[in-house]
Regions:
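WD40-repeat beta-propeller superdomains and closely related acidic/aromatic-rich repeat-like regions
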Residues: 1-330
Length: 330
């Protein structure tokens, strides 16, 4: 088990002039970071810069993913853009771009069986200030054509985060402090895009990594504040508490909350089955113990807001900060 208090910052990367909004470990092991108008690829051996993309200066790049096709990436802005790189990620070209009048935040890709021809097709689900936007890309072998908007799920609320729970279900979180609507978490069906259940009055953190699935039974969601629970195991009102909600996936309800001294912006399930949580001041490590998550260690990171955490390799973590820096801990 890694112990954060014994870790050292082995590298500080100063490649961005704006907040780090997204980090990604590519399928080939290289690292990608994204901020306002800038995407940077780093070599997996020593984290040296191998590709710097700066032509998207007008885009607020909120999230980047690698699609089912290797070395093909999609990032969100006022719409989304698809590009591919060479196998070593040192060259790139744009494949497709879609623009919208509102802001796109986070995207997930899922595959499904086409009932007509029994082929595997792909769709992209994207959260936005206008709700949830679904694009069907069909087989989309060249990634240049076939993209079509097929549905928008809108409950008069801004949806910041979405999370792929399994092959049948995804989750969305809405935050009224962003652009109106409810503070809630919703479970959705992939098959027909119906709302399975809504948990109201959860003010979820706006970060794109604020949800993590611990196992088949437990889901963790970081909260801006805890305002109301109303389950049989918790008090009816708990006001203005920063922390993490623990959800039981069998019953789809909150069963525990972990009160924290600061707002939690990011969550990560590590390869050794502990949870890392990035806050305004610290990175915390949790362990599941007798039905509860207990803090077992913490690491102060110079008062930087830790926006997103990825595991670069076992016991080596990369943390992206709102304060423009990237830290590597081992």
């Amino acid at each position: 088990m890694s112990v954060i208090k014994d870790m050292n910052i082995i590298k500080t990367i100063r490649t961005h002039s704006e907040a780090i909004n997204s980090l990604l470990i590519c399928k080939n092991g290289n690292l990608v970071s994204a901020s306002l108008g800038k995407i940077i690829f780093y070599d997996k051996k020593n984290l040296d810069v191998i590709l710097r993309i700066t032509e998207f200066k007008q885009f607020y790049i909120s999230h980047i993913i690698e699609l089912h096709k290797d070395n093909t990436f999609l990032f969100c802005h006022n719409g989304f853009l698809v590009f591919e790189t060479s196998e070593d990620n040192k060259k790139y070209k744009i494949l497709y771009s879609f623009y919208e009048r509102f802001v796109f935040y986070k995207s997930i890709e899922f595959d499904y069986m086409n009932k007509i021809n029994s082929e595997i097709n792909y769709s992209i689900i994207i959260s936005s200030t206008y709700g949830i936007n679904i694009f069907d890309s069909g087989k989309n072998e060249d990634m240049k054509t076939g993209w079509s908007s097929i549905k928008t799920l809108n409950n008069n609320e801004s949806v910041y985060n979405i999370f792929k729970l399994d092959n049948e279900t995804f989750i969305s979180t809405s935050n009224s402090t962003l652009a109106g609507g409810n503070n809630c978490l919703r479970f959705w069906s992939y098959e027909n895009y119906t709302n399975i259940k809504t948990i109201n009055n959860l003010t979820c953190s706006p970060g794109t990594s604020s949800i993590v699935k611990y196992n088949e039974r437990i889901l963790l969601v970081s909260l801006e504040k805890i305002t109301y629970f109303g389950t049989k195991n918790l008090p009816n009102e708990v006001n203005n508490i920063n922390g993490i909600a623990v959800l039981d996936l069998k019953y789809l309800e909150v069963v525990q909350y972990i009160e924290m001294p600061n707002k939690i912006r990011s969550l990560l399930l590590t390869k050794n089955n502990t949870i890392l949580a990035g806050s305004v001041f610290n990175v915390y490590q949790f362990k599941f113990n007798k039905g509860n998550f207990d803090i077992i260690s913490e690491k102060e990171l110079f008062n930087y807001i830790n926006n997103i955490i990825v595991e670069f390799e076992e016991n080596c973590f990369v943390i992206g900060s709102i304060n423009k820096l990237i830290f590597v801990l081992r």
